[in-house]
């Protein structure tokens, strides 16, 4: 966590916090909504666009994924950017999120949103690209909110693909 890579990632976060997107109220409003309700975004999309109520399966995938995710987070114990900022003398001003009380690595929002995108996209391939774009947007919101480093997001996506590709997931969810 004191490596040059971490310092580079901190500089990237500070740059993002000074970007024009950070000052765009529409973008930041969307990102703040994702912080609290990203599962609801998938539920609404499924109902309104796909025409299927997938609330129960989305809740179950999120619940099951949280167990896997928590094991990974507490294994790696990576501090959040705001926890390292003072030691790196970085001027980082993260959003105060109730969802940011666990270790940073991997990003839970990345993990769960990509897991949902992969699952729903496997059931409805014509929606796969939109769903993965949505998962990406949810994932990068964590950078703009100052809650994760880029590598947290990358590993969240990687772990989600492994999770959804597992025999246990395929058996339980029929993919």
PLM regions and their residue ranges:
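Hydrophobic alpha-helical bundle signature of multipass membrane enzymes
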Residues: 1-148, 158
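Post-HExxH zinc-binding segment in Zn-dependent metallohydrolases
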Residues: 156, 162
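C-terminal membrane module of polytopic membrane proteins
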Residues: 163-175
